[in-house]
Amino acid sequence: MRPPPDPQARRRATHGRGLSAEALALLALMLKGYRPLARRFAASGGEIDLIVRRGRTIAFVEVKARATLEAAAIAIDGRKRARMSRAARAWLARHRLPADAILRADAVFVAPRRWPLHLPNAFEI
């Protein structure tokens, strides 16, 4: 019989999987022509996994890694969207953008042995 899992070890493994998923998501976005502006931006009340730009579009990206793409999509709930919106407002307050900039909230879903699925305009900022 195996001993119960160590909570800290489990947390470290989950964190590592999240970092790997974010790196894979960033690679997928860069191959689509996006340029990274920030990774793991944190402000009081929220965090954004990736902030990327392509042309006039600035995308605030939530990355979710789960066993299936469907499970990843379900993982972005209203509370997570609100936290991301607060962080996006904090980032925007610190950066000057052109008047014609297009802002949106995207999602990238990552599942084992699947290419990341990018959903532009996944939810309101």
UniProtKB/Swiss-Prot annotation:
One of its GO terms (molecular function) is nucleic acid binding. NCBIfam families: PRK12497.1-5, PRK14679.1. PANTHER family: UPF0102 PROTEIN YRAN. Belongs to the UPF0102 family. HAMAP family: UPF0102 (MF_00048). This is UPF0102 protein Mpop_0474. It comes from Methylorubrum populi (strain ATCC BAA-705 / NCIMB 13946 / BJ001) (Methylobacterium populi).
